Design a protein with these regions (language model features):
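Active-site acidic/histidine proton-transfer and metal-coordination neighborhood
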Residues: 15-17, 56-57, 76-179, 191, ...
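Catalytic domains of carbohydrate-active enzymes, especially glycoside hydrolases
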Residues: 18-39, 92, 98-100
Length: 299
């Protein structure tokens, strides 16, 4: 497994220069920097090639995450919205190919966060999303990108709340590059048993996000990391494990993620760096170290 972190751990806004974090995450002991597709909307090919070179020179893999807005909703009943969404993803996937990014994950089958003041048509949205994700998934395949559908908690999304729903959805899409993405923060809310959810995903699991129940760094809370790591080992998962911690309030990030208090305990950038380095070292040991015992999940 390779271990990464999402750039927004250090940021209060989404649309920033994310290149600055390539060397930082390398120095802190990570293999991966996950970037937001938001910054790719208005970026030149030269800028993409510069970022690709920086990552390659540093020995850092890039992955991409995104929470699409309502105008990029593949489940929409409005044909113009769907047309716009497919055009958006086509553009983004071609840019990911230039960046040598092979994984995109997020609520990229609907939109985020959902506006629950409007009526929800889950059955209709499901059918539309399956058809349109099938189209986009084939484009992803042509670009060498796995299109990973994140299972979200009920407060942020409604189409895919459990791994069982995601597995059914992915089976209906039936495109090899369309995979399941699980996130321990969301799983902790919706899954009866996180280990069973991971086992159910099996070889359809394409991307894995980690964070504590309150979105702090792994090791800062009470998540059953040994059991989670054991389940990943049991299914032979050897892909990416990316931390998505959100610990600072304020700005667009804090508002969108609903961080209303300082979970960093007043940490400056140096303290944030030290905490991240300690967390990835902890997770490497728990998930792949000598104490990893997954016999209990194979009963």
């Amino acid at each position: 497994m390779k271990y990464g972190i999402y750039f927004a751990y250090w940021e209060k806004e989404w649309n920033v220069d994310q290149k600055q974090y390539i060397s930082k995450v390398k120095d802190l002991g990570f293999d991966i920097l996950e970037i937001s597709c938001a910054m790719l909307k208005n970026i030149s090919k030269d800028e993409l090639l510069e970022m690709k070179k920086m990552a390659s020179d540093a020995g850092i893999m890039l992955t991409a995450g995104y929470g699409p807005n309502a105008k990029e909703n593949l489940a929409s009943s409005d044909p113009e919205v769907v047309k716009n969404a497919i055009a958006f993803y086509t553009d983004i996937l071609k840019k990911l190919e230039i960046l040598d990014i092979h994984t995109i994950g997020g609520g990229i089958y609907s939109y985020w966060p959902v506006d629950y003041s409007k009526p929800i048509d889950k059955a209709g949205d499901w059918a539309r999303s399956v058809a349109n994700v099938r189209t986009v998934g084939k484009i992803a395949g042509e670009c060498g990108v796995e299109y990973c559908l994140e299972v979200l908690n009920r407060f942020e999304g409604y189409l895919l709340n459990t791994c069982a729903e995601a597995k059914q959805f992915v089976e209906e899409v039936d495109v090899p590059e369309v995979k399941i993405m699980l996130d321990t923060f969301h799983m902790n809310i919706e899954e009866d048993d996180m280990v069973e959810a991971i086992l159910l995903a099996g070889d359809r699991l394409g991307h894995f996000h980690v964070g504590e129940n309150n979105r702090r760094l792994p090791g800062k809370g009470g998540m059953p990391w040994y059991q989670i790591g054991s389940a990943l080992r049991a299914i032979g998962y050897d892909k990416n494990v990316v931390m998505e911690p959100f610990v600072r309030s304020g700005g667009g990030v804090g508002s969108d993620i609903k961080v209303w208090r300082d979970l960093s305990k007043g940490a400056d950038e140096q303290r944030l760096d030290l905490d991240a380095a300690a967390s990835v070292a902890y997770l490497r040991n728990v998930f792949s170290g000598p104490n990893s015992d997954y016999s209990s999940v194979l009963k």
